[in-house]
Design a protein with these regions (language model features):
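Short, Lys/Arg-enriched N-terminal segments with co-localized hydrophobic residues
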Residues: 1-9
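Replace the tail clause
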Residues: 9, 14, 25-26, 135
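Alpha-amylase-like alpha-glycosidases and glucanotransferases acting on alpha-linked glucans and related
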Residues: 11-12, 16, 20, 100-106, ...
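Aromatic-lined carbohydrate-binding/catalytic grooves of carbohydrate-active enzymes
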Residues: 22-28, 33-37, 57-117
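Short, acidic/polar
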Residues: 42-56
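Substrate-binding cleft of carbohydrate-active enzyme catalytic domains
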Residues: 54-57, 61-65, 104, 111-148
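Aromatic-lined carbohydrate-binding surfaces of glycoside hydrolases
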Residues: 69-79, 140-157
Length: 198
């Protein structure tokens, strides 16, 4: 970036609007503890339509920060779409943490109207946002992933995190994860939860 462009950029006042995508457009007011996505609802990327974005831009906002866009661990079953199911014992609640990334190359299916077209919906969200004169920010968390990270959308030739790890070592600089060799997670004393009946 040239000095003149940098100085011009620094004189521009930034105003960032954060939209936690899965809650932003949610119109279901039920707040059932440990409720399913059907019971408690979820916002969708399509809820951030041109009208909403025009209202945000009208506030003097320059950037919209979309939180929770990258696919992360949840208890919602999307295995019919080829998305690996997560162990509920390692998911924060049912909706999960948007920072427990399960695939850096994919979009969270919860916030898509059509799961099969979630990337297209995200691209359309970016297009709509730019069309209203706003810039887009999303969270990218390079050092915090879900324990069951498994990319289904990675480019050819890219290994999953942990794929080449030496699991026989507690710590190795070349590993993506920490391990407890010879120690196994015993969840036999943890009560099970019937997700079908709640």
């Amino acid at each position: 970036m040239g000095r003149g462009l940098f100085i011009s950029f620094m004189k521009t006042k930034l105003a960032i609007y954060q939209a936690f995508t899965r809650t932003f457009g949610n119109r279901i007011l039920t707040r059932k503890e440990y409720g399913t996505i059907t019971e408690n609802g979820v916002g969708k990327m399509n809820d951030l339509d041109r009208t909403v974005l025009q209202q945000i831009q009208g506030l003097g906002i320059t950037h919209v920060w979309y939180t929770g866009v990258i696919r992360h661990a949840t208890c919602t079953d999307y295995s019919l779409f080829g998305i690996p199911q997560q162990n509920p014992h390692v998911v924060k609640g049912r909706a999960g943490s948007p920072y427990a990334i399960t695939d850096y190359y994919d979009i969270d299916p919860d916030i898509a109207t059509n799961v099969d077209k979630r990337m297209e919906e995200f691209e359309n969200l970016v297009f709509r946002t730019h069309a209203e004169g706003l810039k887009v920010l999303i969270d990218f968390v390079p050092n915090h992933v879900a324990r069951q990270y498994k990319s289904i959308a990675k480019p050819e030739g890219v290994e999953d995190l942990g794929q080449g790890d030496d699991t026989g070592k507690h710590f190795d600089m070349q590993n993506n994860f920490y391990y407890c060799p010879g120690e196994y997670l015993d969840l036999s004393g943890v009560p099970t939860y019937d997700y079908a009946t709640g």
